[in-house]
Regions:
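Short, well-ordered alpha-helical
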Residues: 37-189, 193-195, 225-227
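Bacterial N-terminal signal peptides
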Residues: 15-31
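Generic anion/oxyanion-binding catalytic loop in active/binding sites
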Residues: 22-24, 94, 108, 254
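Short glycine/serine-rich loop/turn segments
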Residues: 133, 169-263
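N-terminal secretory signal peptides that target proteins for export/translocation
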Residues: 1-16
Length: 263
């Protein structure tokens, strides 16, 4: 606080902003750790990418330089431990949930085959399984909502109490927000170190989604600042989320546009 007060008294506004951004970056850098396994060979993956005919995929790094991916799972450890990806429960839900439309999921919930809580738990387990796998990770997610399972359970309770849910509704289903959209439960960072702890109120759209029972599962990675400050930077890279990779070919295709984590 003393440092900031000194800056306020002795600097113009531009210098103040620059100094504060620098301090935030230094704080973030102090938490440096690796996102993947201890023996993950990032240099080997970068060498493969260097041979791609698309020069924009000649990345300089893949993992976030500022924080470990382990931060994603904080508050969700019990959910992940309860559903390892080699468990019968995971395989059962994979068949019922993966690549199903909202209408198909709602149909299964109405039949009692699935619950909203199970759907949300499965997607958390699925994200963990993919993002901790050195050969499959996508860096698609910046943050996960530790209260998502509670919200899904509440949606189940509403449905059991007689709530009418249209067959194509998103009620009770988990979605991700791009991380430049405000959501009260998670920081809205735009992928930037300067906004790493930027907690805001709900923006209009998330507020309406929540009011209609949609589960905010987390925030998707994006080109930092939604590609607003840079025209030659790698598409899909952010300091907090790392380099987003394309699920249809991690080393074959770019993740075009600023909404790279949405995949």
């Amino acid at each position: 606080v003393g440092e900031v007060t000194t800056i306020l008294r002795g600097s113009n506004f531009g210098d103040l902003i620059l100094a504060l951004l620098l301090r935030l970056s230094l704080v973030a850098t102090a938490t440096l750790s690796y996102a993947q396994s201890a023996d993950y060979d990032e240099e080997g993956d970068l060498a493969i990418l260097a041979s791609n005919e698309n020069a924009r995929m000649h990345y300089q790094r893949l993992t976030s330089p500022l924080r470990s991916k382990s931060a994603l799972w904080q508050g969700l450890e019990s959910v992940i431990e309860a559903m390892p990806n080699d468990s019968d429960d995971y395989r059962r839900l994979e068949t019922l949930v993966l690549e199903k439309s909202a209408a198909q999921l709602q149909s299964q919930v109405s039949q009692g085959t699935l619950s909203y809580e199970e759907i949300t738990r499965f997607f958390i387990a699925r994200i963990h399984a993919v993002e901790t796998d050195d050969e499959r990770y996508l860096n698609a997610i910046i943050s996960l909502n530790p209260l998502a399972v509670d919200a899904a359970r509440a949606a189940d309770d509403e449905r059991k109490a007689g709530k009418a849910v249209p067959p194509d509704s998103l009620f009770g289903l988990p979605i991700l927000l791009k991380d430049n959209v405000g959501f009260e439960g998670l920081p809205t960072t735009a992928g930037a170190a300067a906004l790493a702890v930027n907690y805001t109120r709900d923006a209009f759209v998330p507020g309406r989604l929540k009011a209609n029972g949609v589960i905010i599962l987390g925030k998707a990675n994006l080109s930092e600042w939604a590609y607003f400050f840079c025209t030659g930077c790698p598409s899909g890279y952010s300091a907090l989320g790392g380099q987003t990779l394309n699920p249809y070919g991690r080393f074959a295709f770019n993740t075009g546009g600023s909404s790279a984590g949405s995949g």
